[in-house]
A protein has these predicted regions:
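HotDog/MaoC-like acyl-thioester-processing domains
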Residues: 1-16, 99-126
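Catalytic strand-loop segment that frames the active site of acyl-thioester-processing enzymes
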Residues: 2-64, 81
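Glycine-centered flexibility motif
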Residues: 9, 18, 66, 75, ...
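Predominant activation on well-ordered alpha-helical scaffold segments within soluble catalytic domains
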Residues: 35-38, 70-74
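Hydrophobic beta-strand-centered segment that forms part of the acyl-chain substrate-binding groove
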Residues: 55-61, 71-117
Length: 126
């Protein structure tokens, strides 16, 4: 497992604004995960859930929903950072989120061919 950067206080975390954290461990985004997310959100667009049609589409395979990719952030955070003396964290929100490249579902692909993600994070001020 990736080793998180340990901050001794929220102030120390704030002083790290602009620094890169990570990378995390690799995470496979497979078709089963994509299908479960589609069922949970009701977003069954063919680029996500129809492998046959998606094979002839612009990405050559199905792709993960952008919001699926975003929803994985809580699972990566403990791999990237920990702040001592903090009992819990909450999602305050996100600004200027973009999805510049798709997360492809491609069984048997080795990282980083598209079915895997290994995030890095950059601390920013609010």
């Amino acid at each position: 497992m990736a080793e998180p950067r340990i901050f001794t206080s929220p102030d120390e975390l704030r002083s790290a604004v602009g620094e890169e954290l990570g990378p995390s461990d690799w995470l496979e985004i497979d078709q089963k995960r994509i299908d479960l997310f589609a069922d949970a959100t009701g977003d069954h667009q063919w680029i996500h859930v129809d492998p046959e049609k998606a094979a002839a589409g612009p990405f050559g395979t199905t792709i993960a929903h952008g919001y699926l990719t975003l929803s994985l952030l809580p699972s990566f955070t403990p791999q990237l950072l920990r702040v001592e003396g903090v009992r819990m964290g909450i999602n305050y929100g996100v600004n200027k989120v973009r999805f510049p490249s798709p997360s492809r579902s491609a069984p048997g692909c080795a990282p980083p061919a598209g079915s895997w993600r290994r995030p890095r994070s950059r601390t920013v001020s609010r």
